[in-house]
Regions:
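Rossmann-like NAD(P) dinucleotide-binding subdomain of oxidoreductase/dehydrogenase enzymes
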Residues: 1-129
């Protein structure tokens, strides 16, 4: 809907393939859900790297969401990777097969994430604190 007369606006969603989500310890499920469900609606799969302080929460949420998706005919949409943040995070932001990475974390790490992803012409969403 446009406020200008005779003006039309269109929104198109295109699948990117794989979306990476790196979330912090605070609100890990909310941050992941904001990104993951939009990506799933667009036809993407999601790899989630939660904070190492909330692994059980991440695994439980991922299992519940995958169960719901599978009951509706969609398999393998959400994956969670638990482990050392710098090792796994570096793999996600350097992987050219992951065109979009959403990052929540410190400003210093956000700069590093931005530079790395920009170097491979990827896209990033950041929520910095």
């Amino acid at each position: 809907h446009s406020e200008r007369p005779l003006h039309r606006m269109y929104e198109q969603w295109h699948s990117l393939g794989i979306v990476g989500v790196i979330s912090a310890f605070n609100f890990p499920v909310a941050v992941w859900a904001w990104n993951a469900f939009i990506a799933a609606i667009a036809g993407d799969t999601v790899i989630w790297k939660p904070s190492s302080s909330v692994p059980l929460t991440a695994i439980a949420v991922q299992n519940i969401c995958n169960e719901v998706m599978e009951k509706n005919g969609y398999t393998g949409i959400f994956s969670v990777v638990i482990g050392n943040g710098s090792t796994i995070g570096e793999r996600l932001i350097n992987d050219p097969n992951i065109p979009l990475v959403s990052f929540t974390g410190s400003c210093n790490m956000g700069k590093h994430v931005s530079k790395t992803i920009a170097g491979r012409f990827g896209k990033t969403f950041k929520q910095l604190f």
